Amino acid sequence: MKFLDEAKIYLKSGDGGGGCISFRREKYIPFGGPDGGDGGRGGDVIFQADGHLNTLIDFRYKQHFKAKRGTHGMGSQCTGASAEALIIKVPVGTIIRDDADGTILVDMVEDGQQFLACKGGDGGRGNMHFKSSTNQAPRRADPGFPGEEMWVRLEMKLLADVGLVGMPNAGKSTLISKVSAAKPKIADYPFTTLQPNLGVVRVEMDHSFVMADIPGLIKGAHEGHGLGMFFLKHIERCAVLLHLVEIDSLEDDDPVSRFQTIEAELAGYSEQLAQKPRILVLSKADLLGEEDRQVVLSWFKERLGEAMPPVFILSSATGEGIEALVYHVGGMVKQWRLKQGKVGHALEDAPTRAGSKALRDEHAPSWQDDDDDDDDDDGVEVIWVRE
């Protein structure tokens, strides 16, 4: 499935139905009074968050959404039927902005959450409302009131607890494939990841969190260079960032400089990302001996000083250090949720977490088609349990 996280659409609620001009005509009552009914209300335009959606791709093919108008009033004081609301479903985590001034109208963060974007027009009054002592047979009725209209921008931000950042080929996709059932494309060349990937990491049986892997960042990303800049918004909601830096060779360029480059890009994108708790993950450590690892650590300590975040040395190839990292991150996420008042774990909140395929597949029936992913047919759920 193609991934689209931004869209611009036009909304128009339904016009109200017109009032009716009618007079009572029955047997033995040839000149009855006015009995024209009111028009029905036009349909509202309502956004609804749907946990089973994970992209805005549908809005690429349809940009105009118009609700139906209300039915006109009828005689015998019959009010016209109101039109049904037009429900537009969007992924959980979608921000809706007024395109005119960029104002945030709503942040759809819960499955089933609804937002009234455009209210339908009221129906017009029938001529029975205009009867008076001086006008016993009014031939006047109101037209229906017009519905509201506007252009809005939809911006989808994934709901994940942990975000993976780093330069291309730093091992982010490999890590998420090792700690969860996610099966992103993995290859030995830069920019293998072209869109965000989500995975559910289960710690013991009663706690889990969602991890997001975004395309690699390069110098100048916050100015539009590379792919990562377009997806940085997807980690703005994360509680913790894992910054992966590969240390496969001491002859390579300076790993500390690469770390500082990406940190500068995060700060350039937003102060919010710069202030998030983070963990420094030195990846591909199986390619270095213990002495060389300590040399790399000393470089970071000397140049970062007190600003140095917690460090984990790991190898996704051998599994070294992964369990300790998972439990440490799980503890940080749990503490963050307690502060935020979010009790529970990711699987309990699965419908509200961007409708991610990674979350839905855990509870999908075994016969469900899986044609959209050629690499995950043998995927298994990973549950980390201390021995």
Swiss-Prot record:
EC number assigned by the record: 3.6.5.-
Entry-linked HAMAP family: GTPase_Obg
Main location group: cytoplasm
Highest rank taxon of the organism: Bacteria
Pfam families, per the entry: GTP1_OBG, MMR_HSR1
Cofactor: Mg(2+)
Keyword Magnesium: yes
General function of this protein: An essential GTPase which binds GTP, GDP and possibly (p)ppGpp with moderate affinity, with high nucleotide exchange rates and a fairly low GTP hydrolysis rate. Plays a role in control of the cell cycle, stress response, ribosome biogenesis and in those bacteria that undergo differentiation, in morphogenesis control.
Chain residue ranges for the region called Disordered: 347-379
Organism of this sequence: Magnetococcus marinus (strain ATCC BAA-1437 / JCM 17883 / MC-1)
Binding site for Mg(2+): 173, 193
Obg domain ranges (all copies): 1-159
Complex formation: Monomer.
Locations listed in the record: Cytoplasm
Entry keyword set: Cytoplasm, GTP-binding, Hydrolase, Magnesium, Metal-binding, Nucleotide-binding
UniProt biased composition (Acidic residues): 368-379
Record-given protein name: GTPase Obg
Single GO term (MF): magnesium ion binding
Keyword Phosphoprotein found: no
InterPro entries: G_OBG (IPR031167), GTP-bd (IPR006073), GTP-bd_Obg/CgtA (IPR014100), GTP1-OBG_CS (IPR006074), GTP1_OBG_dom (IPR006169), GTP1_OBG_dom_sf (IPR036726), OBG_GTPase (IPR045086), P-loop_NTPase (IPR027417)
